Amino acid sequence: IIKQKGFVASLEVFPPKNDLNIDTAIPLLDELSTLKPDFISVTCGAGGTIQSDNTAKLCAHIKENYDTEPVAHFTCITSTKQQVADRLALLKEKGIENVLALRGDRPIEGLSISPEYTYAKELIKEIKAEDFCVAAACYPESHIDCGDLDAEIEHTKQKVEAGASFLISQLSFSSDIFLNYLSKLRNAGVDAPFLAGIMPILSKAQVERMIYMCGVSLPGNIVRILAKYQDNKEDLEKAGIEYACSQIETLKKEGVDGIHIYTMNKPHIAKALMQAARQ
């Protein structure tokens, strides 16, 4: 899916969480498709059947209706090998050819961790054997469960060796962190295309959630933006989008392969950041 076509710009959306009817997401996809992203990825929950079905349904809708390739997120932390095989068969049935293979977040109450998968690399190997194009996640500030950047680099290298064709990174608010991580990847012999994950800050609560969930750090520029605009939602969002656009411009200038925009299902964010990517 990642061809030699210059700077890659892709979008991420999430499906309806508890509703088998995907119609509510169609207007969003209609709008995003006009931005001509290189692909649109669709998230899924950790083991939720409805979410997995909706991921497949939205990917099929993208495939059938737009000139854009879909990428289905695929987690394994609560899955048996049979469940993985069944979900892959469903994706094949719907003509989906691209998958982002993830271990997945630790499950909520009521779901148990599968003993059949410990690492994403195991899932990647299985999916690759079924003739899918596989993307892997990577973590410029290390995975929150790992904490060691050298170990994270080694895990990422193993994912590529298992069959991942390209890498999509977790968000970071620091371009320097992205570039340092990419340099370490290349020095470790990992030459797969790298897409930097970009998410603009929209609120203080959102930033706090990202720190808690992902362990991201806050560069001084972000701290100053939050301090200046935390009492004005509109101005904070505007400043957050401008900052994200400046990140994209820096990364593009420094030769990063591309960016992956976490749209949060907000078309105006996707539009602003795609414009920065295409300049």
Segments and roles (model prediction):
Residues 13-16, 43-47, 73-79, 104-106, ...:
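Active-site beta-loop-alpha junctions enriched in small/polar residues
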Residues 16, 37-58, 104-115, 165-180, ...:
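Glycine-rich, proline-tolerant flexible connector loops at the mouths of alpha/beta enzymes
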Residues 22-31, 49-66:
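Glycine-rich, positively charged N-terminal anion/phosphate-binding segment
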